[in-house]
């Protein structure tokens, strides 16, 4: 992935920080400018994710540092492609109605669609078994930020939404 970033003139910057801003944990981010495009990789955050995940799985399923880096580079590279082509996933999809009163209707795009597409892109490009956000969910469960019960409830809720 680093080679692909270099070929597309995307600078990859490794930052020895946790990537935590207020209550949001960043693992990587891409910044666009006319001068240069930069993907920042928050090494401490990725190492923490990798170590926490690796405690939970069998030896054959453990993540390497290179795999964790490539997962996050692929994810951010998808956002680069959206930006470069000016085709943002949330704009391609039909907007949803967020409010309606009589004939007044307010619609919006769903920004989360771009994140989901980036996860799917990453999974396909790297040949992963699962969408890569599973690593974040394992991390959140293992660190106690969400309970396994709450996670299972989320999955049940998602299934109901997909069926309806």
Please place each PLM-identified region on the residue numbering.
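Short capping loops/turns at secondary-structure boundaries
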Residues: 62-70, 74, 107, 111, ...
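Metalloprotease/metallohydrolase-associated module, dominated by Zn2+-dependent proteases
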Residues: 93-164
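Active-site recognition of the HExxH zinc-binding catalytic motif
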Residues: 68-88
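Conserved binding/catalytic microenvironments
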Residues: 36-52, 64, 84-91, 95-96, ...
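Active-site scaffold of zinc-dependent metalloenzymes
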Residues: 17-70
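Basic, amphipathic N-terminal segments that precede the first structured/catalytic domain
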Residues: 1-25
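Generic structural hydrophobic/aromatic packing signal, biased to beta-strands
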Residues: 12, 41, 73-79, 135
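Hydrophobic, Leu/Ile/Phe/Ala-enriched alpha-helical segments that form helix-helix packing faces
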Residues: 5, 77-81, 122
């Amino acid at each position: 992935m680093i080679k692909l970033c270099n070929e597309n003139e995307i600078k990859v910057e490794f930052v020895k920080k946790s990537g935590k801003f207020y209550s949001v944990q960043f693992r990587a981010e891409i910044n666009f400018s006319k001068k240069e495009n930069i993907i920042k990789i928050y090494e401490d955050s990725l190492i923490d994710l990798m170590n926490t995940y690796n405690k939970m799985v069998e030896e054959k399923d453990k993540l390497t540092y290179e795999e964790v880096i490539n997962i996050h580079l692929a994810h951010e590279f998808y956002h680069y492609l959206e930006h470069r082509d000016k085709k943002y996933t949330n704009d391609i999809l039909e907007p949803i109605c967020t409010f309606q009163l009589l004939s007044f209707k307010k619609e919006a795009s769903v920004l989360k669609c771009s994140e989901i597409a980036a996860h799917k892109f990453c999974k396909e490009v790297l040949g992963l078994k699962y969408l890569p956000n599973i690593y974040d969910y394992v991390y959140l469960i293992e660190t106690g930020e969400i309970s396994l019960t709450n996670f299972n409830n989320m999955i049940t809720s998602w299934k109901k939404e997909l069926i309806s």
